[in-house]
């Protein structure tokens, strides 16, 4: 692929990511506020719906990646985005737990189709040495989109949840049209790969599979910014606008620190060291919320948590792209989402159930201490994994 095509591809992916992240954050943080805070549903039910979306999207990601290896990126991306739009639109009319779950699963099915090929296009459009920096820039752009989306969603929620869902759906329709009209019919792998062969190649890579499964603990922490963090902030502040402040804080940290920290980390630290340092900060931030009694204290700990994500996520994504084999890129990037599937499902369902139990027992600190324990366990498993599998460290060379 000539350099001009790579450069244009990177620009297109950046703009596409902005539309996708706007559509996602307009809707997703508002679901727990709408159904738990406004309608009084059990957080466990809402957590189950969100967890099933996560499990569907990421758990079937390897299938979406394998299909993309065989048929190319564009049909999977366009179809997946339209399916996500349908799921978001149907959320507006969900009147029962079953309807909420169905809407979330439809949304997740869309994501399992478009997410792996988009991740594989990052590999196609970047050279190895520039990949980490490009991923960091994408994350900065996505952070800005997240805060704009969350602010729009929280503002529209004051009027009608239907407006929230239809705006999110409309943004995904726009993204689908852009991909249909602009994105060339790229193949993702160096050669067309049969679905079974791609899956087999990934599953034979035991070190990669082990790392992906361990990272489910990282994601169990990460998804709380969609579930119990918004509930806590809304309860302490007394206004849904405060949820937008959460994402403003995340964006400020990302824009100020993500790229310089990624560049500094590339020069001075290995990928696994950066990943583990980020998990440590996330664990500290989420665990100490158990002892925070004021909104400023919660936001200070959120800042620590977000800083951990800023350090860990570029390293994690770069590590996954470097471990992906050229003959099955889509399959590798699809399987890499399995940790998010398992961790997201566990985090959503467990976080929601813990929140309900803690409120009933008058123990609001309980979910945060349990999540802190999950973070410590994940960190110890990562240390052991990188020690046992030196092949995972050699990708830094």
Curated annotation (Swiss-Prot):
Q: Name one GO cellular component term.
A: plasma membrane
Task: Please verify whether the record's keywords include Cell inner membrane.
Answer: yes
Membrane topology label: Multi-pass membrane protein
Q: What organism does this protein naturally occur in?
A: Aeromonas hydrophila subsp. hydrophila (strain ATCC 7966 / DSM 30187 / BCRC 13018 / CCUG 14551 / JCM 1027 / KCTC 2358 / NCIMB 9240 / NCTC 8049)
Subcellular location, in the record's words? Cell inner membrane
Q: Which residues cross the membrane?
A: 11-31, 32-52, 71-91, 94-114, 137-157, 163-183, 211-231, 242-262, 291-311, 340-360, 366-386
Protein family according to the UniProt entry? Belongs to the major facilitator superfamily. DHA1 family. MdtH (TC 2.A.1.2.21) subfamily.
| Keyword presence, Transport | yes
Residues annotated as signal peptide? none
Q: Which InterPro entries match?
A: MFS, MFS_dom, MFS_trans_sf, MFS_Transporters, Multidrug-R_MdtH
What is the protein name given in its UniProt record? Multidrug resistance protein MdtH
A single Pfam family, by name?
MFS_1
């Amino acid at each position: 692929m000539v350099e001009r095509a790579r450069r244009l591809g990177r620009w297109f992916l950046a703009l596409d990511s902005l539309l996708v992240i706007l559509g996602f954050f307009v809707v997703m943080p508002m679901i727990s506020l709408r159904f738990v805070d406004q309608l009084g549903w059990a957080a466990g039910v809402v957590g189950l719906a969100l967890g099933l979306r996560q499990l569907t999207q990421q758990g079937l990601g390897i299938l979406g990646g394998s299909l993309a290896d065989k048929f190319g990126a564009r049909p999977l991306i366009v179809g997946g985005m339209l399916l996500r739009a349908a799921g978001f639109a149907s959320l507006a009319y969900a009147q029962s737990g079953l309807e909420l779950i169905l809407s979330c699963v439809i949304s997740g099915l869309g994501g399992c189709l478009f997410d792996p090929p988009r991740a594989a296009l990052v590999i196609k459009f970047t050279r190895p040495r520039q990949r980490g920096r490009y991923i960091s820039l994408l994350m900065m752009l996505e952070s800005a989109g997240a805060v704009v989306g969350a602010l729009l969603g929280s503002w529209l929620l004051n009027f009608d949840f239907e407006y929230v869902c239809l705006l999110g759906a409309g943004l995904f329709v726009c993204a689908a049209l852009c991909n249909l009209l602009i994105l060339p019919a790229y193949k993702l792998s160096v050669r067309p790969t049969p679905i079974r062969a791609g899956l087999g190649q990934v599953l034979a890579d035991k070190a990669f599979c082990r790392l992906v499964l361990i990272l489910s603990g990282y994601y169990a922490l990460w998804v709380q910014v969609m579930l119990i963090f918004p509930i806590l902030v809304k309860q302490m502040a007394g206004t849904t606008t405060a949820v937008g402040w959460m994402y403003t804080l995340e964006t400020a940290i990302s824009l100020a620190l993500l790229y310089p920290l990624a560049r500094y980390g590339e020069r001075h630290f290995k990928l696994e060291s950066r990943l583990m340092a980020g998990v440590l900060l996330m664990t500290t931030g989420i665990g100490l919320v158990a002892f925070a009694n004021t909104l400023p204290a919660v936001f200070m700990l959120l800042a620590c948590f977000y800083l951990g994500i800023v350090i860990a996520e570029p390293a994690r994504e770069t590590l996954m792209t470097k471990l992906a084999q050229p003959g099955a890129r889509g399959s590798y990037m699809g399987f890499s989402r399995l940790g998010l599937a398992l961790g997201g499902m566990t985090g959503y369902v467990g976080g929601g159930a813990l929140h309900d139990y803690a409120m009933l027992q008058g123990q609001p600190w309980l979910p945060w201490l349990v999540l802190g324990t999950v973070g410590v366990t994940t960190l110890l498993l990562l240390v052991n994994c990188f020690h046992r599998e030196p092949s995972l460290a050699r990708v830094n060379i």
